[in-house]
């Protein structure tokens, strides 16, 4: 899986270079960034010893550190986390990691126009449900749209049988995912 993702990322990078600075190059770079994010989610999950039950707080903490590092030191310093220990099965952890990655990319892209700004990521558990929140202090208004990332988030939230809520923080936006911890409970 990891080799395939690396290969796709390389091909996207080559295609982007051939397109110069047009809209196709921008789209290809965005696609490459998303493939790299999926690769990070996948590789981070399978570094652990136990791959059936995942400590989501540890997994998200490591994933956020990796993503922050890939976005640069200013972004890494701007991300704050408050992660309660929550255990989920590996399949749900991958899905949650992909949703989190997309929410971080959206905040980076829309709240701050790519410039570093504060991101707050929290994970909590209550009544057999987890709550994963990504909040920013940016310009707000970047709620679910019709683009690829929004469609992917909706699909992934559906796989979890979860709910996504958007709240205007004035300034900024808070996005909260609620989903059952154990899908059979």
Predicted regions: what they are:
Residues 52-54, 71-104, 112:
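Conserved short strand/loop->alpha-helix "switch" segment adjacent to the catalytic nucleotide/phosphoryl-transfer site
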Residues 142-169:
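ATP phosphate-binding glycine-rich loop and adjacent ATP-lid/helix-beta elements
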Residues 29-32, 36, 40, 53-70:
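Short beta-to-alpha transition helix within the HATPase_c
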Residues 118, 140, 169-176:
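Glycine-rich nucleotide-binding loop
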Residues 12-26, 49-50:
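Short acidic helix/loop segment immediately C-terminal to the autophosphorylated histidine
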Residues 1-19, 90-115:
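Conserved ATP-binding N-box helix of the HATPase_c
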Residues 136:
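Acidic ATP/Mg2+-coordinating residue in the GHKL
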Residues 116-128:
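Short beta-strand/loop element within the Bergerat-fold HATPase_c
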